[in-house]
Amino acid sequence: MDYTPLIEKRRQRLEELETVIAEPDFFNDQKKASEIMREHRRLKELMETWDSLNATEQQLADNQELAKTDDPELAELAALEIPELEAALEKLRSDVQYSLLPRDTTEDRDAIIEIRAGTGGDEASLFAGDLLRMYQRFAEERGWRFEHLESSPSDVGGFKEVVCRIAGEEVFRFLKYEGGVHRVQRVPATETQGRIHTSTATVAVMPEAEEVDIEIRPEDLRIEVCRSGGAGGQHVNKTESAVQIWHIPTGVYVRCEEERSQMKNREKGMKILRAKLFEAKKREEAEKYSAARRNLIGSGGREEKIRTYNFPQNRLTDHRIGYTSHNLDGILMGQLEDLIMALQHAEMQERLAEAGMS
């Protein structure tokens, strides 16, 4: 398939953006400027990849010719480089193909992550805490901002439920694969017989919604204030700072008591509610689109078992793509890059096959 016409359209768009960026009042609208700069960067990267692809194709053709030369030493050197050039060319083609696919605009969004302890009692709540710290460390490694929105601590130091927000460059693009049921196999500290217990935690990853994404009418909300039910301290239960919000048409419920200020809790609660409603809207649209097929990486649904963390064997297995790592300790310390790259590659191959570009 000849991608030159598509590339030329992207090149024209890049030139248009460069003209816009050069305007004196470009940064007056910071939000719009940020969106344009992101698009500009992606298109510039595509052009650089396209140029590298053409250069590599030419170099491969030159080496194939040199491999036929009468000079044995030169022919041998040229032939040795051919497999490496072929591998590089294959990757560059995949990168170009993927860049030409329609892009999900929510991939640039910040993310709201909700983690709930599942089966397994106290051990499940401890595992929910492990997952929270894993995402927090990953965010810190990438220079993203991490913020607690709401939590319900357990008696043993874990979480029955915890909600956080991660903000930064393309957060949702990297973390969208985390939605689903995470299973842990390990020996609890209280287990005297050394038996391995299995527990679960459910993760939901939602792109942060903007007001234009979801219309929330005031009459569709029921908002109540109440006293905080926190874990102690002089400010707990002294003022009615906790906020409960119900979205009447859908039944979605949010409670926020993380802040001492009722206004801040309401603001955070609305942020969570908006993300949940936006997620439901996106899921409904995705189900219509994919009704006749099954995504390789899955739907990201809360009921889908995606991963097992086996502590005795220091092993992590992602069941969607058959990925296995014996670096469980490192992964829980936030070293998620290899796993996420494998998931991104699997999604890319699936989307290319769908588009007939593989």
Swiss-Prot record:
Methylated by PrmC. Methylation increases the termination efficiency of RF1. Its main location: cytoplasm. The gene is prfA. Keywords: Cytoplasm, Methylation, Protein biosynthesis. Pfam families: PCRF, RF-1. It comes from the Bacteria. GO terms for cellular component: cytoplasm. This is Peptide chain release factor 1.
